[in-house]
Regions:
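Acidic, mature catalytic/reactive cores of soluble proteins
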Residues: 1-506
Length: 506
């Protein structure tokens, strides 16, 4: 038994419990570190025998050793649970564990031999209902993803509405991650009520035209240091309407969400926090100093691993898409869309002029005050994959080909080309070493969605393109079913083969 933060280590002094046998074939623990919490263990058979030595110390964890820490931990083991079985026989035994507030102590009875099997069957029934609702039939890959999606949907206490967790076990709900994952977790699974609640949750927290970057674990006010979460919000709203599209859905968007979208457009056009503003060329500038406001946001003290201050390519691709989405909504609601259409036209002209890298046949990553960053990164893929884009067909194809050739890495997409002098192919070692690699070559699973969407677009959704896209998904499927946290997709992978899974487990 342990009781600690996910990445912490425990000593004997950290693991102090009130521990007593209970009446249901097990024992009850109350942690000294959280006296309002109760942990109950019960068993359908066997007897408890107190252990003379109640602590297993110096347990070594390989992942922590790889990260250049001692990797030693301690577990509290108050009892041995012993069973007597006849030779050459088998039996079914149920072990149950519950965690609840002390004041909510449930009425427990000793479990039967098949209690655990019954509980597992109830969970399976729930998962089966999710699969049936999603409607993918006997597609095992899709059904596994439907079940995996469920673990990230949670209810936020501050709003009483649904939100999306960015990853398990250590990420809370992040605005950017929520909006990127929104379509896959709620629309592709046909959880439309959850989708609506998630849009409402983040609409309530828009501040100075900015969707929260993250909600802290301890319930403090949200943080807003992001330039892209607000623009991804338009993508989520547009996707919601394209899948649902009922008059009641448009009514909901018009009343609850559309005013927020206009607020965001106004804030970005006239300037808001974190040096986010529209420049004279209608492109969005974001970030300054130590502020990291794109998804490549590693900062340790005064060290910024991937400074992208200026006009990042994906921010401006999202900006154009947001203007087009708002214009379409204005027209649907019988309002004047000309201000959004005219601004989108200016953005498109400036984007094609400033971002196209003729030499490399792709897009610059950032337009900086002192030049243009020609690093080949995956951010440019969104200038092709988003619903509203600005490139010619030939330019879009070249972007996809560049990402395919330079960045595709097994189940993910590299964050930087291996040809770059700052490329790091292995995400391992001490925290500074890992931070240096996080966005400098490490491959990311979520980027595969944007790449495959762009790939299908430039190849006109042909049967050949679909076949190739499924081939690109094969490493994802293998990882999902055989590697890491089985049934989930890891946050990141080494940029170098064999692309070992790293980071957040799900």
């Amino acid at each position: 038994m342990n009781f600690r933060e996910h990445s912490a280590s425990s000593a004997v002094s950290d693991l102090q419990f009130t521990c007593e046998p209970n009446t249901v074939g097990g024992f009850t623990l109350i942690p000294a570190a959280a006296p309002g919490l109760c942990i109950e263990l019960s068993c359908s058979a066997g007897r408890l025998f107190p252990r003379e030595n109640q602590y297993d110390v110096d347990m070594q964890y390989q992942t922590e050793v790889d990260n250049e820490t001692a990797g030693l931990d301690t577990h509290f083991c108050p009892y041995d649970l012993r069973f007597t079985l006849p030779a050459h026989s088998s039996t079914e035994i149920s072990l149950l564990c519950t965690v609840h507030p002390v004041q909510d102590t449930p009425v427990l009875s000793r479990p039967q031999a098949d209690t655990a099997a019954i509980e597992i069957a109830h969970v399976q029934e729930y998962y089966d209902s999710l699969k049936q609702q999603a409607g993918y039939g006997d597609d095992a890959f899709a059904n596994t993803l439907v079940v995996a999606a469920d673990q990230f949907l949670a209810r936020r206490d501050s709003t009483g509405l649904m939100t999306i967790l960015a990853g398990l076990p250590w990420f809370t709900d992040w605005g950017r991650d929520t909006m990127i994952a929104f379509s896959g977790l709620t629309l592709a699974t046909r959880r439309f009520s959850d989708a609506r609640e998630i849009l409402s949750t983040f609409a309530q927290y828009v501040h100075h035209g900015m969707v929260p970057n993250m909600f802290p674990d301890d319930g403090q006010d949200p943080l807003y240091n992001t330039a892209d979460a607000s623009l991804w919000y338009f993508y989520a709203v547009d996707a919601y309407l394209k899948v649902t599209g009922q008059p009641s859905d448009y009514d909901y968007i018009q009343q609850r969400i559309y005013p927020v979208l206009r607020e965001i457009i106004h804030a970005y056009a006239h300037g808001t926090d974190f040096s986010i503003y529209m420049d004279d060329d209608a492109l969005i500038h974001a970030g300054s100093g130590l502020d990291q406001v794109t998804w490549m946001d590693v900062r340790v003290g005064d060290w910024v691993a991937t400074p992208r201050h200026g006009k990042p390519v994906e921010i401006n691709a999202l900006w154009y898409n947001a203007l087009c989405v708002t214009a379409e909504l204005a027209e649907h609601f019988k309002e004047d869309s000309s201000v959004y259409r005219k601004l989108a036209t200016r953005v498109s002209a400036s984007f094609r002029k400033e971002f196209w890298n003729e030499k490399d046949g792709c897009l610059y990553d950032v337009i900086e005050e002192n030049g243009k960053d020609a690093s080949i990164r995956p951010n440019q893929i969104y200038a092709v994959s988003l619903p509203h884009t600005m490139l010619t067909a030939e330019q879009a194809l070249q972007v996809v080909n560049t990402v395919e050739e330079k960045l595709l890495a097994g189940p993910g997409i590299r964050s930087l080309s291996p040809e770059h002098k700052d490329y790091h192919g292995i995400y391992c070692g001490s925290l500074p070493k890992r931070d240096a690699a996080y966005h400098q070559g490490t491959a990311w699973g979520f980027l595969m969605g944007g790449f495959l969407t762009a790939y299908m677009k430039v190849h006109h959704h042909s049967p050949e393109a679909k076949k190739q896209a499924m081939a690109y998904l094969a490493p994802v499927q293998t990882h999902l079913l055989e590697e890491g946290c089985i049934g989930s997709i890891s946050e990141i992978f080494d940029g170098d083969a064999p692309h070992t899974c790293r980071g957040c487990y799900a």
